[in-house]
Every structure is written in C-alpha cells, then in structure tokens.
C-alpha cells in the first residue's frame, strides 16, 4: 500500500523528468531557430554578392574626373580596371551598386579635362586590344553596342532643367598616317555619334559635311564637319531603366531605343565618314561646368560586337 510520502516522491520524479524533457525540447527549438537565422543571413549575403552588372571590362579603359600625378585625367586600363570596385581612386567616380546590379558612373566639374574639351567625364573607352588605343574599327567592318542604362541622379540648372550628359558615343580617330598627312599633333577626329540623356529624354546628334565635295584629305580635318540639328526620341525615360542599341555598317548607322523606336542615318555623310577609324564610348560625359552640379548614371549591361 502506497503512502502519501511515496506518492509525493513519484510525483516529484515524474515532474523532474518532464522538466528536463521540456528544457531539452526548448533548447532544440532555440538551436533550430538560431540555425535558420544564420542560414537566412548567409542567403541574403550570397544574394547581394550575386547582383553583378552584365559588363565585361576587359576591353575598356576608364577616364575619371580626377587628375593623376602629372595633372592629367586619371585613367585605368585593363587588366587593372577589372578591380575597379576595390580601387580607392576609382571608388568615388566608378563603383558597384550590388543592390541594383549596376556600375555607377559619377561625374562633376573638376580640373580633370581631356584635350579638346571643357567638360569632365567618368567614361569608358573601347580598346579592341586591351591597353592599346591604336586598334580600332571602320564602318565597313561593322560594329554593335548595346546598353541597359538608367539615370540615377542629376542636378538642375537655374531654370529647373536637369543637367544633361552624354551616355554613349562613337568617336572618330585618325590613323598615324592620316595624322601625319594633315600635320595634326594627335590622332583626334570628331565624334560621329553622341547620345545624350537630356532632361529625361534621349537625344542623338551626329556630324554632317560642310562641303559634300571635299577631298579625302580635307575630310580628315575636324573643321570639315558640322553638327546636325539633332534628334529626340519620343519616349521619355526620366530616371527609369532603358535599353539603347547602336548598329553600324557600311554607310549606315542605326540607333534603337527600347527596341521600339529607331533612328537611321545613311547617305553621303555616313558614306564619306568611312574614311575614319572609330571606337565606342559609354558612361557619363557630364555637360556642365556649374559649381555643385553632378550626375550619376547606372549601367546594368554593356556589350560590344564586331
């Protein structure tokens, strides 16, 4: 026959066992929650690292709005440009936004100006052969460039309009023989294409001959060419992402916005431009010298084909 004392002992034993089992279960649950939290944090970190722009920089150099030891614009060529994200000099002007999966090109007025311009840039220059500016292409050889772009931020002028910037270019270049023929000190030739982000719209400008009967030698001089009237696409992109394509072939240049609007250039001016070599440019060639002005341009994708 059980006594009250024995029942009490039995109760305490059962209670003790239940308490320990419950403590173990709580500990297991806490450990599971802790493991899940760690896993989620790892996934978030992994996800952030994975948002990379679709841009191969191995055939581009960049010019930044900061000067080097010689007082000239600071440039980074391949292969060093591949480490732009950790380059302390580049970081304020060309940096990775891993949340958006884009490279941001940041430009503002500084003393860092290239020859033949008053404006500054954080801009890529195509190098078909890495580290070499002397290998370029002609219209007859053909070329294609595509970019996925967005204006991230821009200052405004006194009238309330956003400052404009050039986001893509095709720049002409004299061969060494052409340079020597006309006695020019460098290989610079005019840009046949400038694509602007202009107060939320995309504006295109090209070159036209002042005299369509000029000789081949006369064509090599920059003053043989004039700016055209320019063209605005109907779509307003504002600060939204958009896609630009540039297709070049013999005597023809086509610019496409978002796969729906086209601007085609062909005829005598394009045909005679065939005398020049060319290279692509892309980024943020900022078109203001106003104090405090700036712009930031995102590139999610940039590809070139020849």
Predicted regions and their residues:
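Short strand-turn-strand beta-turns centered on an Asx-Gly dipeptide
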Residues: 256-261
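Bacterial Sec-dependent N-terminal signal peptides
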Residues: 1-28
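Ligand-recognition surfaces built from glycine- and aromatic
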Residues: 48-62, 142-144, 156-160, 267-306
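Ser/Thr/Asn(+Pro)-rich, low-complexity disordered segments
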Residues: 45-75, 182-199
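Short, aromatic/His-centered strand-loop micro-motif at the edge of beta-sheets
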Residues: 207-243
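Short tryptophan-centered beta-strand motifs in secreted/extracellular beta-sheet-rich domains
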Residues: 145-147, 240-249, 253-255
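Sec-dependent signal peptide cleavage junction
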Residues: 21-56
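Secretory/extracellular carbohydrate-interaction modules
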Residues: 86-88, 94-211
């Amino acid at each position: 026959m059980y006594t009250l004392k024995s029942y009490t002992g039995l109760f305490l034993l059962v209670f003790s066992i239940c308490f320990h089992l419950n403590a173990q279960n709580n500990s297991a649950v806490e450990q599971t929650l802790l493991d899940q939290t760690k896993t989620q944090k790892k996934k978030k970190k992994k996800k952030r690292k994975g948002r990379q722009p679709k841009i191969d920089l191995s055939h581009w150099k960049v010019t930044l709005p900061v000067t080097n030891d010689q007082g000239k614009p600071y440039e980074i060529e391949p292969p060093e440009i591949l480490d732009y994200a950790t380059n302390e000099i580049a970081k304020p002007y060309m940096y990775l936004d891993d949340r958006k999966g884009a490279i941001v090109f940041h430009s503002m007025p500084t003393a860092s100006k290239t020859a033949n311009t008053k404006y500054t840039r954080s801009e890529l220059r195509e190098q078909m052969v890495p580290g070499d500016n002397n290998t370029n292409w002609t219209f007859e050889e053909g070329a294609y460039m595509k970019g996925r772009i967005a204006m991230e931020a821009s200052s405004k002028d006194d009238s309330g309009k956003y400052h404009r910037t050039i986001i893509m270019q095709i720049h002409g270049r004299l061969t060494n023989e052409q340079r020597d023929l006309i006695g020019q000190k460098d290989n610079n030739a005019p840009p046949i294409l400038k694509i602007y982000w202009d107060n939320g719209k995309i504006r295109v400008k090209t070159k036209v001959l002042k005299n369509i009967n000029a000789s081949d030698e006369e064509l090599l001089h920059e003053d043989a060419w004039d700016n055209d009237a320019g063209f605005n696409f109907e779509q307003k992109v504002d600060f939204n992402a958009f896609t630009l394509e540039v297709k070049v072939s013999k005597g023809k240049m086509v610019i496409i916005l978002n796969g729906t609007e086209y601007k085609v250039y062909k005829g005598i001016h394009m045909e005679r431009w065939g005398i020049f070599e060319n290279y692509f440019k892309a980024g943020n060639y900022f078109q203001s010298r106003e104090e405090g002005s700036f712009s930031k341009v995102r590139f999610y994708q940039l590809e070139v084909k020849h």
